[in-house]
Amino acid sequence: MKLPARAALATALVLGLTGAAAVPALAHAPATGTAVEAPSPRPDARALREAIKGLPNADATAALVRVGGTAGTWRGSSGVHDLVTRREADPHGRFRAGSTTKIVTAAVALQLAAEGTLDLDEPVQHYMPELFGKEFRPIPVRSLLNYTSGLKPGDGFDDEYAHRYDTLDPRTVVASALAKGPEHAPGAEQHYRNIGYTVLGLLIERVTGDTYAHQARQRVFEPLRMRDTYFPGADPRIRGPHNHGYQKMQRPDGTTRLVDVTEWNQSDRFAAGDMISSTADLETFTRALFGGKLLPRAQLKEMLTLPRLAPGVPEAVFGGGPQHMRIGGKAVWLKTGARYGYANLIAATEDGSRTLVYSVNATDAKGRGMNPVAERIVGAALR
């Protein structure tokens, strides 16, 4: 369900954008075949205000935005905390970060690789032989990072909303995926899915003898002082300040209604998408990651390298976690995330002149297309 939304986002962006620390040029990025790019201009405050004005509306109930980088900074918010009290949206509110979680997972795995605890060339079967049948070829750990493992999606609840308070163990999700057998040989094709990162989270736990959540906390959140960021486990609530999330849902007669989906058990998302964070924390993370402060140079290069795939298949657009795109004539690394009621993005230009973090309380966060408010934010920030 998530892949079409992310694919639509990529298409939309390709065709189209106080006092934060600056981000240096990325330590490594794939060759783009273009001349040296001009740095981003100062953030266009007027365009950014226009992008988020008029909330709540049919597309979103709130938006929180942070623009940074060497070219300057801008911060803004719009909308309401909830549709009952209609008080102003909390600009420091926490939200469900969805698949942005994957970049934290990748950072943890790559730190372990730098320490020699995890070998990216070693098959996953070496570490967790009990999971895989003989029908699976050796799956390099690297292929979990860059979405080329060949694993099929795992199964979830048929009626997700009806089961929003129920717990689905990630191991059950993985078992359902592996029962389907491989889709293709590892490394042959790239398919954006959660399953690789769910397995990667379990692998992190296997090699460390620790929980994935604790590893992320001690390696990423605590060193960067990301005090708003945590993993909720089976708790359906968002702790601390947050704005409510709403989702359009279809009635039996075909009409739609807005439903408050703030409370939702994310246990099945695990290392692929269960994180809760804030725009301030994700901006800190974005600066540190792409500024080379979280990973050694070799491991950051690994994250920012597009894999070579089999002849005749579409070229890769994801590295070891983030997606590589050209937006507004500039090379950008980014990652989106979406859970019902919440959509977000982190992005950085390769030259470090612009970073963007947003959270949009989108009423179509799991839809097939890009939310109009999010699209306007990207257009204003990265053009």
Regions found by a protein language model. Give the residues of each.
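Short active-site loop at a secondary-structure junction
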Residues: 85-144, 184-193, 270
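Short, surface-exposed loop or secondary-structure junction motifs
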Residues: 135-332
